[in-house]
From Swiss-Prot:
One GO location term (cellular component): plasma membrane
TM region positions: 1-21, 32-52, 58-78, 100-120, 139-159, 178-198, 206-226
Name recorded for this polypeptide: Uncharacterized membrane protein YdfK
Annotated keywords: Cell membrane, Membrane, Transmembrane, Transmembrane helix
Length: 229
């Protein structure tokens, strides 16, 4: 868990540094930083999709995942619940920034592969690299959205910790297909978040979060019953 703890600390430290900078940044500079973060999220999302979709063995799984996950998220109304919770502590656009931070920090090859490598081989390279990148990203995000970005560190710790424990318990269930499908869906969510920040269209990205749970379930069923497609 050392790598996950390091990653978490880097996000908190970066958020503190960025939050301090925010107090001295004029509105027009904050606006341009928001645009920069929006474009960065769009680019990262497109990169994840184009990099992993060609290697997918289940080319329609991401569509099914988004449809089922979106319906579940809409029924629960995660977006509304999340915004209400965040708005209790902040009247700014922190909710939008925090949701983007959670997606950027948690959905990516390094953030998923890192805990797996640490659990199975004791290799922290991915997590340490991810921690450095997330630290820099959190500085930029917090300089735009404020100290509240640090809350994403708790989500990341829970996310990576869960993957770490799952990898230890279910070593044989972890494979490249699973990571590939999760990354494709995650890339679409990051793209959606970036478009929302840019103001192109306000997508209910958080309502799509349950989509990330569908690929593990489907792939587990496929392997458990030896299904072929």
């Amino acid at each position: 868990m050392f790598g996950t703890i390091f990653n978490t600390v880097m996000i908190i430290a970066g958020s503190i540094i960025g939050g301090i900078f925010k107090k001295g940044i004029k509105d027009e500079y904050q606006d341009i930083l928001m645009q920069a973060m929006g474009f960065a999220a769009v680019a990262l999302g497109i990169n994840a999709i184009t990099q992993h979709l060609p290697d997918s063995k289940y080319p329609i799984l991401f569509i099914v995942s988004l449809a089922i996950g979106g319906l579940l998220g809409q029924i629960i109304n995660l977006e509304l619940r999340f915004n209400k919770l965040v708005n209790k502590f902040s009247k700014s656009n922190l909710a939008e920034g925090l949701s983007t931070a959670v997606l950027l920090f948690c959905i990516g090859s390094l953030s998923i592969l890192g805990p797996v490598e640490a659990a199975l081989h004791g290799d922290y390279t991915y997590l340490l690299t991810n921690g450095m990148l997330d630290g820099i990203t959190s500085i930029v995000l917090a300089s735009t959205f404020g100290f509240g970005i640090a809350a994403a560190a708790l989500v990341l710790f829970s996310w990576q910790g869960s993957i770490y424990l799952f990898a230890q318990v279910m070593e044989s269930a972890i494979n490249t297909d699973l990571i590939n499908e999760i990354t494709i869906v995650g890339g679409i969510l990051i793209l959606s978040s970036g478009l929302s920040i840019l103001g192109i269209k306000k997508f209910k990205t958080l309502n799509l979060l349950p989509s990330l749970l569908i690929p593990p379930v489907v792939i587990f069923v496929i392997h458990a019953f030896g299904l072929r497609f």
